[in-house]
A protein has these predicted regions:
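Glycine-rich adenosyl-nucleotide cofactor-binding module
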Residues: 67-89, 344, 348-381, 400
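DnaQ-like (DEDDh/DEDDy) 3′-5′ exonuclease domain used for proofreading
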Residues: 1-102, 108-132, 138, 300, ...
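PRPP-dependent phosphoribosyltransferase catalytic core
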Residues: 400, 404-620
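Active-site-adjacent helix-turn-beta-strand microarchitecture at beta-sheet edges
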Residues: 18, 23, 209-356, 372
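Signature of N6-adenine DNA methyltransferases within the class I
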Residues: 136, 149-150, 159-223
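Conserved S-adenosyl-L-methionine
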Residues: 125-129, 133, 150, 160-164, ...
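SAM-dependent methyltransferase catalytic-core segment centered on the flexible catalytic loop
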Residues: 66-69, 81-84, 88-152, 160, ...
Length: 620
């Protein structure tokens, strides 16, 4: 029989077989042991093991940039690489900034849909579920950090891992933050049914903070029939259109106080159910006497001649679109339902074939499904992340929804390049959507040109905090900073100075001015330029430093015009929160050098010092 954890702790305390130090360690271990929930055997993952020695960064593939001429075009991002590496890099650029995450992870069906350590996991693998849970768990923990306070995450899944995923999400994202398990009917039937035809999948939905659920989600404007509101009166501007409803009703909820007469224009009285006298036949008015008097006075009640009633009259009340029956302004919507049954999976294949002329990707989700989910979130300027991007449906849906409702949502996609999917499918699909294309019928489809797209690959810098690695990480930080600040236009001149990329780089855009200083010898000259530059905005200055010191003293004369940040320490600080522990002792020991004096050798600064020992691209 299993012992209660507290019983085991008491047994350890009373035992004479252990020293006090051993007892302390055992008790601590027992207290940390999970008593309820999901338990599985952690399986090592090669990409995580690689991160014990290397920090992931992002490097732009500039020739693939698609830059819109529209001034306010959102900048979308496509990252080619393992999503665990990309998530670590995004911890620096987007921690607490992602409003919507949608992911469609492998379902672990055992039919070659899930790869772990470069091998397919089949149905006979005894660690099949443990590998999948280890894989998803690592990514969800980082994803939670990326969510904003009002952030929402949608996760598609089927019966193979739904039960395990729900428990895992309760543990990582918080059971109290569970919103709904949306049921999606993806097809009308299944020929391969095992006794019962499975036609549905699930979309687990969680929010970052349960107390902000009401603010995070939009309402369903289609929850009422707009066509019913077909009449107008003199109150149209303030109340909107209306329809009529009967004022009387019959049923079990009878009350004498609601069975009273209403005076008609001909001087007679009318009771509920068209009666001219008081009778308890179960019928009453829906409104009390005082409210009816108020309704008659303010145009909410309509008395019309009617041949159907013995009195010759009928009494109806008006249901307005924009106010309730007491005159209060309302938004006639309702929460979205957790059932989606009007979008089929077959729609996804049709969209892919329409763009490419062939079904080049078999596992994409329907465009309208993702657009529907994004629209559930009450933020037309949301930043959206999909780190199992596949064919890139989430970006396509984001751009389509922006075009529909005028939003400025930005989307970040992450996918590996297995079978060249990132280059040949994800990128090409969305390039066509932006620039326009000819569909399978030979018709021209106009592009959604008010969108920019930038393409990045994951690169790596050594994790040891050597002088060489620090410099390499600072040099590699430029693309991360552009993403972090949403500023992509690089200028080669700063004031009157012509900049060397190995010394300093300057970016403008999105109402921001970003200066990256890689050689502290240039600070004196750059400070003088800032003094004389005519700019109402502050300069965000990222400056290379061996530690956390951002040269505040050197910038003292322009302190009110700059915001300083030391690199690469700010990158180390962000990434260390999610990176696995190092494999050797002495990890992250500081170098002997503690000041910036002589930190840069002039020759090294000009070369950029991008040696193979400190920075590499995993694809090479």
């Amino acid at each position: 029989m299993k012992k209660d954890p507290q019983e085991l702790i008491d047994s350890v305390r009373q035992s004479s077989e252990f020293s006090n130090e051993e007892k302390s360690k055992l008790i601590d271990s027992l207290r940390k042991k999970k008593h309820y929930g999901l338990v599985w055997e952690e399986k090592p993952e090669e990409v995580e093991e690689n991160q014990r020695n290397w920090i992931p960064v992002l490097k732009e593939v500039k020739e693939r940039a698609i830059v819109s001429e529209a001034v306010d075009a959102p900048n979308h991002i496509l990252i080619e690489g393992d999503n665990l590496d990309a998530l670590v890099a995004l911890t620096y650029t987007h921690e607490g900034k992602i409003d919507v995450i949608y992911i469609d992870p492998p379902y672990n069906t055992g039919n070659k849909d899930f790869i772990y350590n470069d091998k397919f996991v089949d149905a006979e693998d005894s660690f099949r579920h443990s590998k999948w849970l280890s894989f998803i768990s690592r990514r969800l923990k980082i994803a939670k950090r990326l969510l904003s306070d009002k952030g929402v995450i949608f996760i598609s899944i089927d019966d193979n891992e739904q039960a395990q995923l729900k428990l895992l999400c309760d543990e990582i994202l918080g059971e109290r933050n569970f919103v709904s398990q949306i049921i999606w009917r993806k097809k009308t039937g299944a020929l391969d049914a095992k006794g019962i035809s499975t036609t549905t999948e699930y979309i687990l939905t969680y929010c970052k903070s349960d107390y902000l659920i009401d603010k995070a989600f939009s309402k369903d404007s289609g929850a009422y029939d707009e066509k019913r509101f077909k009449y107008q009166d003199e109150y149209y501007e303030s109340r909107g259109p209306f329809y009529f409803d009967t004022l009387d009703r019959g049923g079990l909820r009878y009350s004498d106080s609601l069975n009273y007469p209403i005076l008609l224009p001909n001087g007679k009285q009318l009771y509920p159910h068209g009666r001219e006298t008081f009778v308890n036949d179960g019928w009453t008015w829906k409104w009390g006497k005082e409210k009816v008097e108020w309704g008659l006075k303010h145009g909410f009640i309509d008395i019309q001649k009617s041949s159907k009633n013995p009195s010759g009259y009928s009494i109806r009340y008006k249901v307005y679109m924009n106010v309730d029956n007491e005159g209060n302004t309302i938004n006639r919507t309702a929460p979205h339902k957790n059932l989606i049954n009007d979008i089929l999976n077959a729609d996804a294949a049709a969209v892919i074939k329409n763009i490419f002329g062939d079904n080049v990707f078999k596992y994409s989700k329907p465009l309208d499904l993702i657009r529907r989910l994004i629209s559930f979130v009450n933020n037309p300027n949301a930043t959206i992340l999909d780190f199992f991007a596949g064919s890139g449906t989430t970006l396509h849906a984001t751009m389509a929804l922006n075009d529909e409702d005028g939003g400025r949502r930005q989307c970040i996609l992450v996918t590996n390049n297995e079978n060249r999917i990132c280059e040949d499918v994800t990128y090409v699909r969305n390039k066509k959507v932006i620039e326009g294309y000819v569909n399978a019928k030979g018709e021209t489809v106009n592009g959604l040109t008010a969108n920019s797209l930038r393409y990045y690959r994951t690169n790596f810098v050594g994790r040891d905090k050597t002088a060489q690695n620090r410099r390499a990480l600072a040099a590699a930080s430029a693309d991360l900073l552009c993403i972090r600040e949403g500023t992509y236009s690089e200028l080669t001149v700063f004031g009157t100075l012509k900049l060397k990329p190995s010394v300093a780089r300057y970016f403008e855009g999105n109402g921001k001015h970003i200066l990256l200083i890689l050689n502290e010898n240039a600070i004196e000259y750059l400070v003088k330029e800032i003094e004389y530059m005519d700019s109402p905005d502050k300069f965000k200055v990222y400056v290379f430093s061996p530690g956390d010191y951002a040269y505040d003293d050197e910038f003292a004369d322009v302190a009110d015009r700059v915001e300083l940040c030391a690199v690469p320490s700010s990158i180390y600080n962000a990434c260390e929160k999610v990176l696995p522990a190092r494999t050797h002792d002495g990890f992250f020991e500081e170098d002997d050098e503690t000041s910036a004096d002589g930190w840069f050798d002039e020759d090294q600064a000009e070369s950029g010092n991008d040696s193979d020992s400190t920075i590499y691209n995993k694809e090479e």
